Amino acid sequence: MATSHSLGEKILVKLIRFYQLAISPMIGPRCRFTPTCSCYGIEAIKTHGALKGSWLTLKRILKCHPLSKGGYDPVPPKINNNVEKK
């Protein structure tokens, strides 16, 4: 089943896609992580929503610098707090 995304999420994803298609090719590959920071941002926003996804993306971008080791850094899974505990 497809999930519905808010207008804010759609706008943020479009901005990241614009960066991927128009800006990133001009500056070349620079990300030290897998998935790339822009792919991470799209996945974080789609998984966690506009606010938390943006926060996770900002934290990730701040970690992506020449002194960073980089490596595999996936988007954390969404935790469902509505699950009944037995």
From Swiss-Prot:
Keywords: Cell inner membrane, Cell membrane, Membrane
GO cellular component: plasma membrane
Membrane topology category: Peripheral membrane protein
The keyword Metal-binding is annotated on this UniProt entry: no
Main location per the UniProt record: membrane
Pfam family, one: YidD
Subcellular location: Cell inner membrane
Function: Could be involved in insertion of integral membrane proteins into the membrane.
Family named by the database record: Belongs to the UPF0161 family.
Descriptive protein name: Putative membrane protein insertion efficiency factor
Originating organism: Mannheimia succiniciproducens (strain KCTC 0769BP / MBEL55E)
